[in-house]
């Protein structure tokens, strides 16, 4: 038997299953302030999110795009606190509002909700409390203690009153995690540092103390071990005994040496301390004694956050895998566990009493019996009273105390017992009775009242009966508390509180006979009866049948009261109340039509007989109500045409309830009946419902009656909202035909939906008196030309003036164009232009007139506009064109007029007068146009002057292009004329730059010589001299030396450098020498002329250090190392030591390099110099000097030199150097190359570097030193990233056994990880398959199952593959594998266990097919397992198809309880085949879901009589009585025939059976049939039949029974009449007392009595004509 556990462990959910990234499940990103919410910060893509998981609805996490450093949810409500930097904010998520915000001066390193409205904030220096209430800011509580400096804060706790505050942090010290706490007293304002890892506060009430004590619990893992401390903080409350301190050891397993406590919660319900450690262990301690109750590991991952679990008074937490786990006390098991497993009965008793826990019943009973046997009755009473769950508070205990006699002068043990019980709480039922009986006998009723008020007694019916004899009112109170309805109602009646009966009965759910009560009340007072009836039906479920209540009203002909009652009772308008609604309306339509009209108008009812009520309404003259109820179109058309009798607004709304076809028919009928009277209402209906009735249908309707007025008003109501072009056109038509010209204008102007061409043509044809609509259409849709032609030809010129003056003056140009086209008079056109002033485009007007060569027509108008001061360019352009054409002094106009458009006018002049075009273009700076006209007309002088004056580089660039054919004549004019004339330096500068930019050096030289050498004002200009030399360098190098010697005011260094760049080295050397720049001169000789000899001579002549340095550098570059070193020494220049070192390295001149570096070291103690010197010593193999040098003071990079020596395989030197700097990693590598493997391993151990271990390991493998290789490999395999490379290295060289040996040894390492177990499994699958199963069974939870799955599949290890699929919960694949490879993988138990867990139910049917093929004898066992999810119909169909139904008969029998049709029919077929009629009959009786008739028809032809009998039975069950009886008669089943005839309740069938028996001369059967079909046979028919066949003897028992029945009925009627009279007399004198058993008299017994004895009655008394008071009756 499994051991009982004192805890209940539960996994609530997996965060990864909710889409939470595992990387975000950690202390810094996940918070849980309570068991209500979990809050996670995530980053999805580039967006930061906060995920909130409501633990009551975990499947629907809330995601919000929030960027924050931290987020914590309020413990109880959807309020979130967010921290970003130093900014803190609190938001209400449900209200979507910000509640508070604050910016801290210091960073908040930790924060936590410590109550529902307070957040604790921890900074590096202090702790603050921030309340959500009001506008308060964070309040500083205390400064952090120095002992917490540098600690990571992991928790903050307070006691219930927030008088004691605790801050907890951890830090790494001496290879262990040390916990530090700061306990702060708010009252005393002092702190105490404590070493501890986890802590909590608790309120605990000790036995004998009046007040609770505040306890502080904390756990610590120190160097000496773990401890749990429980102490009381502060001064104990007055009268309290102080809590004794507790300090107990906390056990940590040997394999968890680095484990330590991380969380603590205390259960207030059970007074149990829950302690959780980093390695996932849970410890339970008793708070009072400190005893360890239980310890176990609940998680393989660290649980990093916890909170109290309120639902179970336990602890809930989240681990790093995302599991949300909870642990709580298992109340049913903890006491037995403490008693039996811990063997601590004292603790068990203490906890059972303290926390009211079950499980210690035997201990309490034993203790009670022992005390009772000792005579210690007071203690025994305490034990019995305090026993948990009231296990000893039994009648037996009371009897035992009653049996003890009271001692004189002492309280009896029984009263002591009751006294203790009363002090503790409420007495139970038996205790209350036993206590009250003597109290009432003593007349101390006031004690009973006191106990009732204090709720000390458990009330019961027996207690009420006991009290009633003393005080009925007090008894009523007891009955009420005990919930005894019949007695309560009886007491209400006895105390005169009848009005409370209904309220009380509804309250407690008690149901008396309400109709009987109502009749009695109605007889006394109809009004009170109405009120009482309303009380009966005022709830959703009436207390009595409303129909019966109405019958009671109608018995007394109370129409008005009945109406009022029904209106109230039927207000909920339920479908089941339809007949009552009809009855209500019918009675009022007949007696009070106005009341019925009001009822119908209120639309209270919808379930009455509408057709019947409609006819009644029409007869009563309520035509509107009749229409509301009519459904037949003929009835509706008959009524609807009488619109003068109907409310128009109602009628319009009524059409909304009709179908489209009916609505159109009704409208047609209304227009046909009286179009004048009904047109308005028809228009209203059409307007409102045009969308449903379709606008086209309505238009056709009005047009069919030629009602354009109706069409106008209808379309007018919808045209503003319609987008249909036809609607707008029809509306325009209708408006025209009804003379609504203004409306035509409006719609033409505002509508965007009509077809303009169609409307234009219609308006032309309509010949309206007002042409404004046509004008609007043509103006809007650009038919202006057509409009002008139409108006002009129809002599409607005034509308042209109206159009351009009032409608759209901007259209004047088009109108003028049209008038010119129709040869209108110029005077008319001029007048028209003058009338329309400035409201049109002059450009367009000029264009229209100019197109027709009539520009002069505008001259007077244009001059008038200029005279008026018009500055519009278009006006001046037109005037300029006219002046140019007429040669009216145009040049003066073009130079002086500032308003015309130069480009337009210039273009106009180009062909007429190029000079005028130049004037216009120059005035407007139209560069391109001016250039083109000058080029075309050879005006180069004008162009050159314009270009010089213009000073535009881009413009110069465009004319100086090589592709320009006019460039040469233009340049000649620039050189000869334009520049000679100018005195402006800027013009010269721009021109020269333009020539430079255009890359015209020869032309530029020509230009510059004219400026510089011809003694002009610009001769001494430095820039021009520079430019002349530079241009000569580029274009004519023969002149350069001449210019250098002739000119003196140029920039020598720049010119020299440019000469160098153009390979004029001698000229550059001459410039440097002329200006004494020797370093540059020697540089030219070295770098450009390349003559080191001349350079050496020049250096000796100058003898300057800088020159020697230049020469040395050149020599070094030429590979003349020795000469270069000599030159550097002469220059006294060690600055180029790097280049010297590199040159020596390249050439191998190490001896020379040593000399140079020794010289350089004297000058400069550079690290590089000393480093290179060491390397040079190593290269020259001067190891003794090298060792002496590195042991002395130096600045060399010895590590770097060692690496270089290592790279160049100088391992002896490298060994010295690495040893000097203690670089054990590289030293180990060096030793490997020297073949010193053991020393290399020692070096690697000192280096403790993965790379080093790997290198040494690989070397050892190559050297076949596998023992050393394994030592190295054990340090590598613990790093998951390195494992694959190591394995590949071994495998590539074929060392499989050694690799497996190493991995097996590594499994025991503390840092063994999943990759090691996984790779070992893969290796087993390849090389040692026989060991794989054992490995997987031991370590399946630690391998990467998907990876091992692939390996097992590749290795064809099918059994192992199934095992892995099972553990990975891929049950579908496991089943498929077993079925595909049954020889290796199939195991019966495993298959049946896994198949129930598959997700794809289709595998069930594959499994069935598999078993049928391979394991047919086990098929039924499989089907039993599959049956809960199996589609039995499909399964049966399958077995039927393969003809294997008999094989699965046990399965079919087991699932027949589902009453599945296919199963039933298959089993029935099997039973028929097996001829098992008993099983078939049993199946038919138990399971009815099959084709009864088909089976019966099949069985009636069966050769066995029992099956034909079953066929008759089935026909009977399907009410085919005649067929059933006929089948019985055919097979001589007389008893069955009589029984079926009796059950049919068919008199004719019974009488036919009687006749058949007589025909067959079965007289005994005739007598038996009379007995069996007694209720169906008519006595007169039986008498006649018996007399005719002379068998009166066989019929005589029947007649005796009939006579007996009639006589008994008469006697009963006589007795009931007498009884009725007696009760009537008694009722008149007796008040109504309810609650007694009621006698409900009926019209007679209605239960048929079996005829065997005594014979039943078949008579029913006729109903009375009038209801008799005091009787209930049924009809």
Swiss-Prot record:
Which residue intervals make up region (Involved in spindle localization and interaction with TACC3)?
457-507
- Keywords attached to this entry: Acetylation, Autophagy, Cell cycle, Cell division, Coated pit, Cytoplasm, Cytoplasmic vesicle, Cytoskeleton, Disease variant, Intellectual disability, Membrane, Mitosis, Phosphoprotein, Repeat
* Chain residue ranges for the region called WD40-like repeat 1: 24-67
Map out region (Binding site for the uncoating ATPase, involved in lattice disassembly) in residue numbers.
449-465
Per the record, a Pfam family?
A: Clathrin
Q: Does the keyword Nucleotide-binding apply?
A: no
For the region Globular terminal domain, what residue ranges are annotated? 2-479
Question: Sites of the modification N6-acetyllysine?
Answer: 856, 1441, 1501
Impact reported for residue 506 to E: Disrupts spindle localization
Q: Which residues carry this modification: Phosphothreonine?
A: 105, 394
Region (Proximal segment): which ranges? Answer: 639-1675
Q: Where is this region: Flexible linker?
A: 480-523
Residues that the record marks as modified (N-acetylalanine) are 2
- From the UniProt entry, list the residue stretches annotated as the region WD40-like repeat 5: 196-257
Q: Where is this region: Involved in binding clathrin light chain?
A: 1213-1522
Record text on subunit structure and interactions? Clathrin triskelions, composed of 3 heavy chains and 3 light chains, are the basic subunits of the clathrin coat. In the presence of light chains, hub assembly is influenced by both the pH and the concentration of calcium. Interacts with HIP1. Interacts with DENND1A, DENND1B and DENND1C. May interact with OCRL. Interacts with ERBB2. Interacts with FKBP6.
Function per UniProt: Clathrin is the major protein of the polyhedral coat of coated pits and vesicles. Two different adapter protein complexes link the clathrin lattice either to the plasma membrane or to the trans-Golgi network. Acts as a component of the TACC3/ch-TOG/clathrin complex proposed to contribute to stabilization of kinetochore fibers of the mitotic spindle by acting as inter-microtubule bridge. The TACC3/ch-TOG/clathrin complex is required for the maintenance of kinetochore fiber tension. Plays a role in early autophagosome formation.
Q: Which protein, by its recorded name, is this? A: Clathrin heavy chain 1
Q: What is the lineage of its organism?
A: Eukaryota, Metazoa, Chordata, Craniata, Vertebrata
């Amino acid at each position: 038997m499994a051991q009982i556990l004192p805890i209940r462990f539960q996994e609530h959910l997996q965060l990864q299953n909710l889409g939470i990234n595992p990387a975000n499940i950690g202390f810094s990103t996940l918070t849980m302030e309570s068991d209500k919410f979990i809050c996670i910060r995530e980053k999805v893509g580039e967006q930061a999110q906060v995920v909130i998981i409501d633990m009551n609805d975990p499947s629907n996490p809330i995601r919000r795009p929030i960027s924050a450093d931290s987020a914590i949810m309020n413990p109880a409500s959807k309020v979130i606190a967010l921290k970003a930097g130093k900014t803190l904010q609190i938001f209400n998520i449900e209200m979507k509002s910000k509640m508070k915000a604050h910016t801290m001066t210091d960073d908040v390193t930790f924060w936590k909700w410590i109550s529902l409205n307070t957040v604790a904030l921890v900074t590096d220096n202090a702790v603050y409390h921030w309340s959500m209430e009001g506008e308060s800011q964070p309040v500083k509580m205390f400064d952090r203690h120095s002992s917490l400096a540098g600690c990571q804060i992991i928790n903050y706790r307070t006691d219930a009153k927030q008088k004691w505050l605790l801050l907890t942090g951890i830090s790494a010290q001496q290879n262990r995690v040390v916990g530090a706490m700061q306990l702060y007293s708010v009252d005393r304002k002092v702190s105490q540092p404590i070493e501890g890892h986890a802590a909590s506060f608790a309120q605990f009430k000790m036995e004998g103390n009046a007040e609770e004590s505040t306890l502080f619990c904390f756990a610590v893992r120190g160097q000496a071990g773990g401890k749990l401390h429980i102490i009381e903080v502060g001064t104990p409350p007055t009268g309290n005994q102080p809590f004794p301190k507790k300090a107990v050891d906390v056990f940590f397993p040997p394999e968890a040496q680095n484990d330590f406590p991380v969380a603590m919660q205390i259960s207030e319900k059970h007074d149990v301390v829950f302690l959780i450690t980093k390695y996932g262990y849970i410890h339970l301690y008793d708070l009072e004694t400190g005893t360890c109750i239980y310890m176990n590991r609940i998680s393989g991952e660290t649980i990093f956050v916890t909170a109290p679990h309120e639902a179970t008074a336990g602890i809930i937490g989240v681990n790093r895998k995302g599991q949300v786990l909870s642990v709580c006390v298992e109340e049913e098991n903890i006491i037995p566990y403490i008693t039996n497993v811990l063997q601590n009965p004292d603790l068990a008793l203490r906890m059972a009493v303290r926390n009211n826990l079950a499980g210690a019943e035997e201990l309490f009973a034993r203790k009670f019996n022992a005390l009772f046997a000792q005579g210690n009755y007071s203690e025994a009473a305490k034990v019995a009273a305090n026993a948990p769950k009231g296990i000893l508070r039994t009648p037996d205990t009371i009897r035992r105390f009653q049996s003890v006699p009271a001692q004189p002068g002492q309280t009896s043990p029984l009263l002591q017992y009751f006294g203790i019980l009363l002090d503790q709480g409420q007495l139970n039922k038996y205790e209350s009775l036993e206590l009250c009986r003597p109290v009432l006998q003593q007349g101390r009723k006031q004690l009973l009242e006191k106990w009732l008020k204090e709720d000390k007694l458990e009330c019961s019916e027996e207690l009420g009966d006991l009290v009633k004899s003393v005080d009925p009112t007090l008894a009523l109170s007891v009955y009420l508390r005990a919930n005894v309805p019949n007695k309560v109602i009886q007491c209400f009646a006895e105390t005169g509180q009848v009005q409370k009966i209904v309220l009380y009965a509804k309250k407690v759910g008690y149901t008396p006979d309400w109709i009987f009560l109502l009749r009695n009340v109605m007889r006394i007072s109809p009004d009170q009866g109405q009120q009482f009836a309303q009380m009966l039906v005022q709830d959703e479920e009436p207390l009595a049948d409303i129909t019966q209540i109405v019958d009671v009203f109608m018995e007394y002909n109370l129409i008005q009261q009945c109406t009022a009652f029904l209106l109230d009772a039927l207000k909920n308008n339920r479908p089941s109340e339809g007949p009552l609604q009809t009855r209500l309306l019918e009675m009022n339509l007949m007696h009070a039509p106005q009341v019925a009209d009001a009822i119908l108008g209120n639309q209270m009812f919808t379930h009455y007989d509408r057709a019947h009520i409609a006819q009644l309404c029409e007869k009563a003259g309520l035509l509107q109500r009749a229409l509301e109820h009519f459904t037949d179109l003929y009835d509706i058309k008959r009524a609807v045409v009488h619109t003068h009798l109907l409310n128009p607004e109602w009628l319009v709304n009524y059409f909304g309830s009709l179908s489209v076809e009916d609505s159109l028919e009704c409208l047609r009928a209304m227009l046909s009946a009286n179009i004048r009277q009904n047109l308005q209402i028809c228009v209203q209906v059409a307007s409102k419902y045009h969308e449903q009735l379709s606008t086209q249908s309505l238009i056709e309707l009005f047009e069919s009656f030629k009602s354009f007025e109706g069409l106008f008003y209808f379309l007018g109501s919808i045209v503003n909202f319609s987008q249909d072009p036809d609607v707008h056109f029809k509306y325009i038509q209708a408006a025209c035909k009804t003379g609504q010209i203004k409306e035509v204008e409006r719609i033409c102007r505002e509508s965007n939906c009509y077809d303009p061409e169609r409307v234009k043509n219609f308006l032309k044809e309509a010949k309206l008196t007002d042409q404004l609509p046509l004008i609007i259409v043509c103006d809007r849709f650009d038919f202006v030309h057509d409009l002008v032609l139409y108006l002009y030809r129809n002599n409607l010129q005034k509308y042209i003036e109206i159009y351009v003056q009032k409608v759209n003056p901007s259209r004047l140009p088009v109108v003028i164009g049209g008038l010119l086209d129709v040869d209108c008079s110029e005077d008319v056109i001029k007048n028209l232009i003058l009338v329309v002033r400035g409201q049109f485009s002059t450009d367009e007007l000029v264009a229209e007139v100019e197109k027709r060569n009539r520009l002069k027509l505008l001259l007077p108008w244009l001059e008038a506009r200029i005279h008026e001061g018009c500055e519009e360019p278009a006006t001046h352009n037109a005037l300029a064109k006219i002046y140019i054409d007429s040669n009216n002094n145009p040049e003066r106009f073009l130079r002086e007029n500032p308003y015309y458009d130069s480009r337009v006018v210039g273009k106009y002049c180009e062909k007429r007068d190029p000079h005028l075009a130049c004037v216009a273009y120059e005035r407007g700076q139209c560069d391109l146009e001016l250039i083109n006209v000058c080029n075309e007309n050879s005006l180069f002088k004008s162009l050159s002057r314009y270009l010089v004056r213009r000073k535009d580089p881009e413009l110069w660039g465009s004319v100086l292009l090589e592709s320009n054919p006019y460039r040469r004549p233009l340049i000649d004019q620039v050189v000869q004329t334009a520049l000679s004339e100018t005195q402006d330096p800027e013009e010269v500068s721009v021109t020269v730059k333009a020539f430079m930019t255009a890359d015209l050096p020869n032309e530029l030289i020509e230009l510059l010589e004219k400026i510089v050498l011809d003694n002009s004002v610009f001769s001494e200009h430095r820039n021009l001299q520079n430019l002349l030399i530079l241009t000569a360098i580029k274009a004519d190098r023969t002149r350069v030396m001449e210019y250098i010697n002739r000119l003196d005011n140029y920039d020598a260094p720049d010119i020299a450098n440019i000469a160098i760049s153009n390979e004029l080295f001698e000229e550059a050397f001459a410039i440097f020498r002329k200006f004494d720049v020797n370093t540059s001169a020697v540089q030219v000789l070295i770098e450009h002329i390349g003559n080191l000899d001349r350079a050496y001579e020049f250096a000796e002549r100058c003898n300057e250090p800088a020159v020697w340095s230049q020469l040395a550098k050149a020599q070094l570059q030429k590979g003349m190392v020795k000469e270069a070193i000599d030159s550097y020494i002469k220059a006294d220049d060690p600055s180029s030591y790097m280049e010297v070192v590199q040159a020596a390295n390249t050439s191998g001149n190490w001896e020379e390099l040593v000399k140079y570096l020794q010289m350089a070291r004297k000058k400069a103690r550079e690290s590089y110099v000393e480093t290179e010197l060491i390397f040079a010593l190593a290269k020259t193999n001067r190891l003794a000097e090298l060792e002496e040098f590195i042991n002395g003071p130096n600045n060399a990079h010895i590590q770097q030199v060692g690496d270089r020596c290592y790279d160049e395989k100088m391992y002896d030197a490298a060994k010295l150097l690495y040893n000097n700097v203690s670089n054990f990693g590289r030293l180990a590598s060096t030793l490997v190359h020297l073949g010193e493997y053991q020393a290399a391993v020692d070096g690697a151990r000192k280096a403790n570097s993965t790379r080093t271990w790997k290198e040494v390991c690989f070397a050892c493998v190559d050297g076949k030193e596998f023992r050393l290789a394994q030592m190295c490999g054990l340090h590598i395999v613990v790093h998951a990233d390195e494992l694959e490379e190591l394995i590949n290295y071994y495998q590539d060289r074929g060392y499989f056994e050694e690799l497996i040996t190493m991995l097996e040894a590594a499994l025991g390492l503390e840092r063994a990880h999943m990759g090691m177990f996984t790779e070992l499994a893969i290796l087993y699958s390849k090389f040692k398959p026989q060991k794989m199963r054992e490995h997987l069974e031991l370590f399946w939870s630690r391998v990467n199952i998907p990876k091992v799955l692939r390996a097992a599949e590749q290795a064809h290890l099918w059994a192992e593959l199934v095992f892995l699929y099972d553990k990975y919960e891929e049950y579908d694949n496991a089943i498929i594998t077993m079925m595909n490879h049954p020889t290796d993988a199939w195991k019966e138990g495993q298959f049946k266990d896994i198949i129930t867990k598959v997700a794809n139910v289709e595998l069930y049917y594959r499994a069935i097919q598999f078993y049928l093929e391979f394991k047919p004898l086990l098929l039924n066992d499989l089907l039993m397992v599959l049956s809960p999810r199996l589609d039995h119909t499909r399964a049966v169909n399958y077995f039927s198809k393969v003809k294997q139904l008999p094989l699965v008969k046990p399965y079919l029998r087991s699932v027949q309880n589902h009453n599945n049709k296919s199963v039933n029919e298959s089993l029935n077929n099997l039973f028929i085949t097996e001829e098992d009629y008993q099983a078939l009959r049993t199946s038919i009786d138990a399971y009815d879901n099959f084709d009864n008739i088909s089976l019966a028809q099949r069985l009636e032809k069966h050769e066995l009589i029992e099956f034909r009998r079953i066929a008759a039975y089935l026909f009977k069950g399907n009410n085919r009585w005649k067929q059933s009886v006929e089948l019985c008669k055919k097979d001589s089943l007389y008893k069955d025939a009589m029984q079926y005839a009796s059950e049919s309740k068919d008199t004719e069938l019974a009488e036919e059976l009687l006749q058949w028996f007589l025909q067959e001369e079965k007289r005994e059967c005739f007598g038996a049939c009379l007995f069996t079909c007694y209720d169906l046979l008519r006595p007169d028919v039986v008498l006649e039949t018996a007399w005719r066949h002379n068998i009166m003897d066989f019929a005589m028992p029947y007649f005796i029974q009939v006579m007996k029945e009639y006589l008994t009925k008469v006697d009963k009627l006589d007795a009931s009449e007498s009884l009725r009279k007696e009760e009537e007399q008694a009722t008149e004198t007796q008040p109504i007392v309810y609650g007694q058993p009621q006698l409900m008299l009926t019209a007679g017994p209605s239960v048929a009595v079996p005829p065997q004895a005594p014979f039943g009655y078949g008579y029913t008394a006729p109903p009375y004509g009038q209801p008799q008071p005091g009787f209930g009756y049924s009809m």
